From Swiss-Prot:
Belongs to the AAA ATPase family. Residues 18-106 form a coiled coil. This is Proteasome-associated ATPase. Consists of three main regions, an N-terminal coiled-coil domain that binds to protein Pup and functions as a docking station, an interdomain involved in ARC hexamerization, and a C-terminal ATPase domain of the AAA type. InterPro entries: AAA+_ATPase (IPR003593), AAA_ATPase_domain (IPR050168), ATPase_AAA_core (IPR003959), ATPase_AAA_CS (IPR003960), NA-bd_OB-fold (IPR012340), P-loop_NTPase (IPR027417), Prot_ATP_ID_OB_2nd (IPR032501), Prot_ATP_ID_OB_N (IPR041626). The keyword Secreted does not apply.
Length: 601
């Protein structure tokens, strides 16, 4: 094979030189293409290797970009939500403002008073001085409307809302309820009479002649009963929580007033059987501070307890109308008399309930003075007859009694004091030594803190210690010694008399002495001393109380002062103080005495 191939080759090469060249060129071209492809592939491989090495960083970049885009998206979503909320709020505000504008643009609503209803659904109302028949909105229950009730009207004067009853207007006095039951005759502030309709609240409750009513004058309706403020200020209906056991030194006076007030009420049948009329009134008179008002309060409390025991009901009570005498006086003509009438009208109302009523006039001499004794006015000329007529009117009632208190009974009109009016007269005198011990025992009790030294003196016996304290201070107060001399009075006939502090003692003074001593004990303990009330404090308090009263007799009219203090009899024209001080006995001071007019000047 080599021989022929060589032969043919040598013959070909020598014979076809162009074919070899073309093949070589083809080979070179093919090799170049392959080299180019290899180079391209190598570049591709290198590029792929670079891309492969760079892919984690790109992934991180893409992840970071994705996170940024997500954050921007979340922020855009939040802004969108806020924008939506703002738009919604703005829309609501626009709606509200539109409603407000519409409301403000509406015509004003009116008010009227409902009068009556009809079967066709219409009603009568009183508005702007006119009585109109109008229709009612379906939202209003016509059946629930009451005569006199206030209603709201729209611009077409239709009822659109039911309201409450009127709460302002004028005050009038009820004279009588007319036969129809829904009308009343009233008296205005100018004493003019008119007929008004009664609103539902007054139809539902009892009203009596003399009640104060609130009316709306334009509609002519009365809406409610108004408490009598002018009487409420003068009257205390609550029964005071004071018992007889709290009053000292007045046993005989307490027994007298109990016989006069309690027995007629508690034993009505026996009184009726013996044809015995109960007293209409009681006068308690005597010096100031001796327990007149206290007795009157205790009577009401005791009577309430007795009523509860007899009736067996836990709500048994007695009414105590405490009239503040000077406050009854009024500068307007007829006002004082009117208030007296209202007081007794209140008493009759309470007595009609079957409970005892005590009408207590304190400082009775200030309003019921003897007629004709006035200097600048003659007001007593009408006040006294008004009281007399009211007391005589009490005769028809079983449960009302009048109690008066005064320290100038000589100034009260005699017509009030005669039998048949203030039948029983009880003098509440200044306490003597025995009564003073009883009063001291109400305030100085064994349960108080007692000074250890005083307590040790009686071997720790508290009762004995207290009794000794009381005995010692009473002896000091009532001793007719030089240091207890108070005044020397000269009477119009020339006689002279020495008065001691005991002659001006009272329950109020004893209470004040004990209070002083207790305050001394408190201060001594605060300053580091031993705790407890001691005899020394009581004696010192007694001396301080005496010294405070040194200048009290210095009045323009000594006779008037002496009468108020309980010293009755011959007229006093001169007073000389006898109180012994640090500089000895003071000289008597002359007191100008004016003509005895029987009046305070």
């Amino acid at each position: 094979m080599s021989g022929p191939r060589s032969g043919s080759g040598s013959g070909g090469s020598t014979g076809r030189p162009g074919d070899a060249e073309s093949r070589r060129s083809a080979y070179e071209k093919e090799a170049h293409e392959l080299t180019t492809q290899v180079a391209f592939l190598e570049e591709e491989v290198a590029m792929l290797r670079r891309r492969l090495s760079e892919s984690p960083r790109q992934v991180r970049v893409l992840e970071e970009r994705l996170a940024e885009v997500q954050a921007e998206l979340s922020s855009a979503t939040g802004q969108n939500d806020r924008l939506v909320a703002t738009l919604r709020e703005a829309r609501d505000q626009i709606v509200t403002l539109k409603e407000e504008v519409d409301r403000l643009a509406q015509p004003p609503s009116g008010y009227g008073i409902f009068v009556s209803r009809y079967d066709d659904g219409t009603v009568d109302v009183f508005t702007q001085g006119r009585k109109l028949r109008v229709t009612v909105s379906p939202s209003v229950d016509v059946g629930s409307l009451s005569p006199g009730q206030e209603v709201m009207l729209n611009e077409a004067l239709n009822v659109v809302e039911a309201r409450s009853f009127e709460r302002q207007g004028e005050i009038v006095l009820l004279k009588e309820v007319l036969e129809s039951g829904d009308r009343a005759l009233v008296i205005g502030h100018t004493d003019e009479e008119r007929v008004v309709m009664l609103a539902q609240p007054l139809l539902d409750g009892p009203i009596r002649a003399g009640d104060s009513l609130l009316i709306e004058p334009r509609s002519g309706y009365a809406f409610e009963r108004v408490p009598k403020s002018e009487v409420e200020e003068l009257v205390l209906e609550e029964v005071p929580d004071i018992g007889y056991e709290q009053i000292g030194g007045l046993k005989s006076q307490i027994e007298s007033i109990r016989d006069s007030v309690e027995l007629p009420f508690l034993y009505k049948d026996l009184y009726r059987e013996h044809q015995l009329k109960p007293p209409k009134g009681v006068l308690l008179y005597g010096p100031p501070g001796c327990g007149k008002t206290l007795i009157a309060k205790a009577v009401a409390n005791s009577l309430a307890k007795k009523v509860e025991a007899i009736t067996g009901q836990g709500n048994g009570r007695a009414f105590f109308l405490n009239i503040k005498g000077p406050e009854l006086l009024n500068k307007f003509v007829g006002e004082t008399e009117r208030q007296i009438r209202l007081v007794f009208q209140r008493a009759r109302e309470k007595a009609s309930e079957g409970m005892p009523v005590i009408v207590f006039f304190d400082e009775m001499d200030s309003i019921f003075r003897t007629r004709g004794s006035g200097v600048s006015s003659d007001v007593e000329n009408t006040i006294v007859p008004q009281l007399l007529s009211e007391i005589d009117g009490v005769e028809q009632l079983e449960n009302v009694i009048v109690i008066g208190a005064s320290n100038r009974e000589d100034m009260i009109d005699p017509a009030i004091l005669r039998p048949g009016r203030l039948d029983v007269k009880i003098k509440v005198e200044r306490p003597d030594a025995e009564a003073a011990r009883d009063i001291f025992a109400k305030y100085v009790v064994p349960s108080l803190p007692l000074y250890p030294e005083d307590l040790a003196e009686f071997d720790g016996n508290r009762e004995a210690t207290v009794a000794a304290m009381i005995q010692r201070v009473v002896e000091r107060m009532y001793a007719e010694s030089e240091e207890n001399r108070f005044l020397e009075v000269t009477y119009a006939n020339g006689d002279k008399e020495v008065l001691y502090f005991k002659d001006f003692n009272s329950g109020a003074m004893i209470e004040n002495i004990v209070a002083r001593a207790k305050k001394m004990a408190v201060k001594a303990h605060i300053e580091g001393g031993l705790k407890g009330l001691r005899m020394q404090y009581l004696l010192a308090a007694c001396l301080d109380e005496f010294k405070e009263n040194e200048d009290l007799p210095n009045t323009t009219n000594p006779d008037d002062w002496a009468r108020i203090s309980g010293k009755k009899g011959e007229r006093i024209v001169y007073i000389r103080t006898l109180v012994t001080g640090t500089k000895g006995t003071e000289a008597g001071r002359s007191i100008d005495t004016i003509a005895n007019t029987g009046q305070y000047l």
